């Protein structure tokens, strides 16, 4: 009788111990799942923030490029204005050097050899 009772108690103790082991295993797995999920969320946030930073950098670069383009355009406009002014000055100089309305200089600002062809 005592032997049967002892073996039954051993069996119960074994089952309780096994149940506790399974429960602790489940909890640790649950904890692992939670931490893995958190890690994924953190990773997504990190990637999202990186993408935002990249977009901001691209936007800044684009605005810098636009500024540079505007500067280039204004520089080329200034150059065009300077060229136009120079051309006007050259034309004025040539127009001053005429005989009876005929330019005595050719387009290279050289004196024409034959004025009246």
Curated annotation (Swiss-Prot):
Keyword match Glycoprotein: yes
Annotated keywords: Glycoprotein, Secreted, Signal
GO annotation, cellular component aspect: extracellular region
Known glycosylation sites: 61, 72
Cell location: Secreted
UniProt-annotated stretches for the region Disordered: 42-117
Biased composition (Polar residues): 96-110
N-terminal signal peptide: 1-24
Low complexity composition-biased segments: 46-95
Main localization category: secreted
UniProt-recorded name of the protein: Putative uncharacterized protein DDB_G0287599
Species per Swiss-Prot/TrEMBL record: Dictyostelium discoideum (Social amoeba)
């Amino acid at each position: 009788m005592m032997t049967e009772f002892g073996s039954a108690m051993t069996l119960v103790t074994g089952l309780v111990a096994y149940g506790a082991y399974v429960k602790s295993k489940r909890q640790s797995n649950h904890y692992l799942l939670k931490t893995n999920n958190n890690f994924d969320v953190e990773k997504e946030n990190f990637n999202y923030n990186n993408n935002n930073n990249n977009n901001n950098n691209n936007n800044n670069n684009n605005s810098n490029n636009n500024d540079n383009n505007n500067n280039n355009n204004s520089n080329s406009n200034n150059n065009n204005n300077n060229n136009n002014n120079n051309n006007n000055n050259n034309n004025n100089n040539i127009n001053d050097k005429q005989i009876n309305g005929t330019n005595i200089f050719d387009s290279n600002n050289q004196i024409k050899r034959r004025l009246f062809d």
